[in-house]
Every structure is written in structure tokens, then in C-alpha cells.
Amino acid sequence: MDITKWLVTGDTHGDFTRFYNLHEAVPKDEIWGVIILGDAGLNYWLSKRDKVNKGRIAHKYPRLSFFCVRGNHEARPEDVEGMDKVFMPDIGNYVYMELDYPNIHYLMDGHEYMFDTYRTLVCGGAYSIDKYYRLERQALGGYGGWFANEQLSQEEMENITNTFKGEEFHLVLTHTCPWSWQPRDLFLSFIDQSKVDDSMEIWLDQLKENITYGVWLCGHYHDDRQLAPHAEMLYYDIRFLEDIMEYWLEDLDTTTL
């Protein structure tokens, strides 16, 4: 598979209808890669319902190849029955995928990839602010959709820091964002923020001081906006990765990246 263009978008939560017009624009002899910044929602129900949705996506969008950062409202791909770990030469590292759905791939936390010519670090996961509502629904016999290992563990965060401290990346892809960039105007007023576990956001703040990066992209907060210089949050927009990178990297000396 030779991917000719790369795009990036935010949370889809299982609804891939936004990609219909994009797929129609892809030449019939090309494949375009789409990075989803977490909560793709393809491993949410852990039942036949997920399989039906993935089958529909694989059939409907054959000229799009999806690469999913892990969000919080979905199972870790390694916990999903039938997942294989496959090396992908296009991006230079391993992904998880189910062979029945060849255009859906799950990026691995704490791994580096090459998207186009951009050295990229990927760190998925986040805390669910509706955790207790989901657990209550589950206790009443409904489906909660809460995953105990939704966040990176302390050990995982430490390993990522130790592995990549001092490294240089063109691009960082995360689901949530560093604590200092959080869009607090989007916080839900009925959520007691003192009960929210923001350990991952605090760690990401530390990580961004321990690596060099050109651009940082995240999802999670359901809005499209700039968070800081060289940092953007995506939700519904579908952007060409090259356009984002060229915009932010034109004022940087990237010869050492």
C-alpha cells in the first residue's frame, strides 16, 4: 500500500459519514491516509455491533486508510479479540489491525512513526469526565462503555519519557492535550473539576518540555481551534497534514529534526 496523501481529523465516535465526500475526491488509483486523533469509536461496544460498523467502513471507503490514535471511549486494541500486530512499511512501525478490515489501523501508544516525511510520536488515552455516570449506568444493567485502562499508566508514562527525553519530532499526536493548553471554556459546568483525574495532562505538560517538536495535534475536547503556537485541536475538520505542517514549520529551523 502506497499512501499518496495524509489527512488528520478529530473524534468520530463510530460515525464515519464525514468521510463520504472526501472518499469521492480520492482518485481511483490512489489511497489517502486519514489519522483520527482518538475516540474513533470502532472498539466501543465490543460486540457484533462494532464488527458491523467496521465492515461497513471497510466496504464503503476502500480508497481511505484509517490510522487511529487511541482515545478514552474505546478499548485498547490489544484487548480486542482478533487483533493482529502488523508492521507497516508506509509508516515505519507496527500497528494493530484486524485482517477482515484492512483499511483500519490502530497506532500504538508511545511509538514513533513516519507520516509522509514527518517523524511522529503517538500517545493515546485520556480520563473520561463522565466515568461515574458510565459506571452507574453499568451497575443498573446497562452498557457503561468505561474502560479501566483508558489512561496511560504511571509506568507507561515514565517509560515514554525515559525513551524519548531529548528527542526531536516533527509531529506529536495525542488524544488529550497538555494541562497548560486545556480549553477550559469548554469544560462542562456540571462536572466537579476537583474530581477529574488530570494526571495525563500534567504528564504531557512535562513531556513537551522534555522533547523538541514542530507541531502538536490533539482531539478529545470536541472543537477545532489553535491551542498555542504550533499546537492545534481538531474535531470535525478534516485537514491535509502537509498544509498543517507547512504552516507551522515555515518559521522553524527543521534541519535538525
Feature-to-residue mapping (PLM):
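Conserved beta-sheet core of the metallophosphoesterase superfamily
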Residues: 58, 65-69, 86-91, 180-255
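Short, solvent-exposed loop/turn segments at secondary-structure junctions
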Residues: 13-14, 41-43, 73-75, 125-129, ...
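Active-site-proximal loop/helix segment associated with metal-binding centers of metalloenzymes
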Residues: 91, 116-198
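Active-site-proximal beta-strand elements of phosphoester/diester hydrolases
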Residues: 3-13, 117-126, 171-175, 233-237
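Core catalytic region of metal-dependent phosphoesterases/phosphodiesterases
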Residues: 9, 14-115, 193, 204
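Proline-aspartate-enriched helix->loop->beta-strand connector
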Residues: 31, 169-178, 212-213, 218
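A short acidic (Asp/Glu
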Residues: 18-19, 45-48, 78-81, 132-133, ...
